[in-house]
């Protein structure tokens, strides 16, 4: 398909005339897609309300209509779900598509970079500002540098290419000053031919939004490096944003939970300490929770966990084998029904691991136990960002109300040594370590309540009702990080 035909097909999917910036971005995209250079890459940077989502949606619909293969990816499960809703086709986490498990070691599974068997495929990655490249998380996944691995994966395929979509005004990954995946210079360093464009003009449909009006003003402060005073948020004249006096917060949160539910309401705050205060206040004063943890509570995973999904895959495989043996043993049924029917979720469709930031709803609290100086519970959990997948797992309760992001190093060491005492009858150290790494209490999920979260945890998500708590601020506390956070 030539440039003009592809451009025409995309315009047909818009439903309204594109803005000049969208039209320019479209020109760049069709040049990128028709470039014969196998190492072409494109960056689509767009601020809030500039039509980035509608443009990417039109691109996806067009490519599917003309039978061009496309794969949608995002850094987190929540972001992938939003990308899927906006585009009308399935989206996956980057980790799920580019890594495969090499070995399971209890605390940290080892994931190698997968072979790219895709051909002639466009990989579209949304929320690319979240893609890190410092390897702060260790080397559990590939090289430990997500951007490196993503680029290596895509361009080892035959005639595959990459489109990175994101907002450079958002918070960069932890430990980085800017988002490397949105930097043309960074991508050129990989030997790639970079196409890039920026959307800055707020589209007409968004101009009546107070959220986007204020986000645009804050983004302009970032763009022009004009961070000399605290931003003045405008509330008057808009129906989608308002100032919330503290005295009204409890009633307002209760109304939100009633109108849109716990899953679609969030409080975004600046620190784990303040998130902890909000979570306790919401549970006690809004939801009337009296127990430490109850059915209906919303939780967030705060440390990657590989054990429980590996156990789930084993159980699924065992049940499927058992069902096959049962059918084969009944010769009449085997002849009448040669195919084993099962409602089991295929093991390859469940999450590879539970990631830091994943949310879960407590469906049932079935057992509590105090062991090794810590508190545990067995829970039935439902994961709204993974098609309401249900999983029974052991959870560590001590992290629920701690001010630390997860168990501290000293606490992790304490738990390890206490559990090790139960395996002293195993003489060989290697065998003993293997047994500990398979212990359900050593691998208990570390969780916090998910009614209030920090901005990094919320990034890439989408909620119907959002409460933003900036805390007490003075001019002396004004920093670029704060402005990015507020944006």
What is the predicted role of each segment?
Residues 2-40:
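Conserved pre-motif I regulatory segment
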Residues 3-6, 29-30, 37, 154-160, ...:
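Conserved helicase motor core of P-loop NTPases
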Residues 18, 72, 267:
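Conserved SAM-binding loop
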Residues 22, 52, 76, 271, ...:
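Short, conserved phosphate/pyrophosphate- and ester-handling motifs at nucleotide-, phospho-/glycolipid
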Residues 26-27, 31, 36-231:
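ASCE P-loop NTPase helicase motor core
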Residues 88, 282-286, 484-487:
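Short, solvent-exposed amphipathic alpha-helical segments in soluble enzyme
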Residues 358, 373-487:
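C-terminal accessory regions
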